[in-house]
A protein has these predicted regions:
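Arg/Lys-rich, intrinsically disordered low-complexity tails that mediate electrostatic binding
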Residues: 1-21, 25-26, 147
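Conserved hydrophobic alpha-helix
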Residues: 182-186
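Catalytic-loop of the protein kinase fold
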Residues: 187-204
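C-lobe/activation-segment region of protein kinase-like
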Residues: 210-212, 216-390
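Conserved structural core of kinase catalytic domains
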Residues: 85-170
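ATP-binding glycine-rich loop module of kinase domains
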Residues: 34-122
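Activation segment signature within eukaryotic-like protein kinase domains
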Residues: 175-176
Length: 397
């Protein structure tokens, strides 16, 4: 039997504007999700027919269980959430089950869209990666999470339409709604979505004016007493739309930082912003090596932001020169952001300070990070503007 997380949906189907509704047909995988990939229509559960008007997310067993457990945990935290707020969150009418045999339609695009998921598991017979030819022999390694089908994502809406003033106002209103009405309620209950971005906001098929937040695969909840740091935060992958300070949530980084400061103190070297910068610079280099994709996305955003502004003022206007300038701008911004956090939440580093040096990462998480990580996510929608060519916008003169 499927595991179910249901509440009755009393909404009435209304005639909708097709530009908000994803009209593709078939069972093919069509979008990557956090730690999994999504199929439309839903994949059948073992012993059950496919559910109409549902989609399926295929995940490795451990990730499926974590995501489903967190959806249940978050739902229990949000029992008193106003209906006018919860309508923006896809948390109800969700089930987890064993996947039935995948049909030829289900296998379309599976290696392209689900490649990141399939490569994590080896086929029992060949010991090679799972692919379209052998996945049906390895379904015991996967679960599916079935959820109500929604319309087109905000990302695709922006990608598929000319952005005129009406569309821009509508997108801005979505961001404002989340910042003012949705995220504060999540913050109060200690819930972090952790992966807010334009592809994870889909328009409701019942009411196209309601942008619904999906994909809770990177979510977590804070401790009830708002002390300490959730264990999950130490293991989740860094996303490009996260605050730059996210990589500080590592026990190794914290231990290295405190050890570095104690060494400076022992050698009677004055601890200043510039001396701490010596520690942060190699951390940034390590971040680039370990998070190449995230780094390249952020660099492209910075490049689009500054490209037109500084090009006219540099003598060497070659691509390599421009790339070096963007690299310097981004690295300086990143390093200074992290420095601000370290300086603000490190105690006993003053010239006359006594006692042990303490970096209070827990205080930073509960006072600041808990409240701004999803804000960074929702504001990342604006990044897409920066990546569009000017011809994408249809603005009256």
């Amino acid at each position: 039997m499927p595991h179910k997380n249901k509440k009755k949906n009393k909404a009435t189907r209304k005639k909708t504007n097709k530009k908000y509704i994803n009209v593709s047909e078939g069972g093919a995988a069509f979008i990557k999700g956090g730690y999994g990939c999504i199929f439309r229509p839903a994949i059948g559960c073992v012993g059950h027919k496919r559910r109409p008007n549902y989609i399926s997310k295929l995940l490795i067993n451990e990730y499926a269980k974590r995501e489903y457990d967190y959806i249940s945990k978050i739902n229990s935290r949000l029992t008193k959430l106003p209906v006018d707020v919860k309508k923006y969150l896809l948390l109800d009418n969700i089930e987890m089950c064993e996947p039935g045999k995948l049909s030829p339609d289900d296998l379309i695009n599976i290696e392209t869209v689900c490649g990141d998921t399939l490569m994590r598991i080896n086929d029992e017979t060949t010991k090679g990666s799972i692919n379209a030819y052998n996945i049906n022999n390895n379904l015991n390694k996967f679960k599916i999470i079935n959820m109500p089908e929604l319309g087109i994502s905000l990302h695709d809406f922006m990608d598929n339409n000319k952005l005129d003033p009406v569309n821009l106002i509508e997108i801005n209103n979505i961001i404002i709604t989340y910042v003012l009405n949705v995220l504060p309620y999540l913050n109060k209950t200690g819930v972090v979505h952790g992966d807010i971005k334009a592809p994870n906001i889909l328009f409701s098929k019942e009411n196209v004016k309601i942008p619904v937040l999906i994909d809770w695969g990177l979510s977590y909840v804070s401790n009830n007493d708002k002390k300490g740091i959730p264990e999950d935060l130490y293991t989740l992958r860094i996303q490009w739309q996260h605050p730059f300070s996210t990589f500080l949530f590592s026990r190794d980084v914290v231990a290295q930082y405190v050890s570095f400061l104690n060494k400076l103190k022992h050698e009677k070297i004055k601890i200043t912003r510039e001396s701490i910068r010596i520690f942060v610079i190699p951390l940034f280099s390590n971040f680039k090596k370990k998070n190449t994709r995230v780094y390249n996305i952020l660099k492209s955003v910075f490049s689009s932001s500054f490209d037109t502004g500084y090009k006219a003022y540099i003598k060497d206007n070659t691509p390599s020169s421009r790339d070096n300038i963007v690299e310097q701008i981004f690295s300086n911004y990143f390093i200074n952001y992290v420095l601000d956090v370290l300086i603000a939440y490190t105690t006993n580093i003053g010239e006359n300070a006594t006692g042990s040096i303490v970096f209070d990462l827990s205080k930073y998480f509960n006072d600041v990070y808990l409240y701004n990580v999803d804000i960074w996510g929702i504001v990342s929608i604006f990044y897409q503007y920066l990546l569009f060519p000017s011809t994408k916008f249809n603005m009256p003169v």
